[in-house]
Amino acid sequence: MAWKVSVDVDTCIGDAICASLCPDVFEMGDDGKAHPVVETTDLDCAQEAAEACPVGAITLEEA
């Protein structure tokens, strides 16, 4: 199943756990916030990263 990945940069606190858990999907931007590097993914790590985000800034929707 493919997932559409988004990060609410207003909510993101720059913890970087998502980029550590799933570097193929998330990267840290120059603004210190997480940003998806792909629009959709089927990687399980994206869900793991969303669950690990301490502020719930990551949203996954069925693509």
UniProtKB/Swiss-Prot annotation:
It holds the Pfam family Fer4_13. Keywords: 3Fe-4S, 4Fe-4S, Disulfide bond, Electron transport, Iron, Iron-sulfur, Metal-binding, Repeat, Transport. InterPro entries: 3Fe4S_ferredoxin, 4Fe4S_Fe-S-bd, Fe-S_cluster_ET. Disulfide bonds join 22-45. Residues 3-31 form the 4Fe-4S ferredoxin-type domain. Binds 1 [4Fe-4S] cluster which readily converts to a stable [3Fe-4S] form. Its cofactor is [4Fe-4S] cluster; [3Fe-4S] cluster. GO terms for molecular function: 3 iron, 4 sulfur cluster binding; 4 iron, 4 sulfur cluster binding; electron transfer activity; iron ion binding. [4Fe-4S] cluster binds at residues 12, 15, 18, 53. Ferredoxins are iron-sulfur proteins that transfer electrons in a wide variety of metabolic reactions. This is Ferredoxin. It comes from Thermococcus kodakarensis (strain ATCC BAA-918 / JCM 12380 / KOD1).
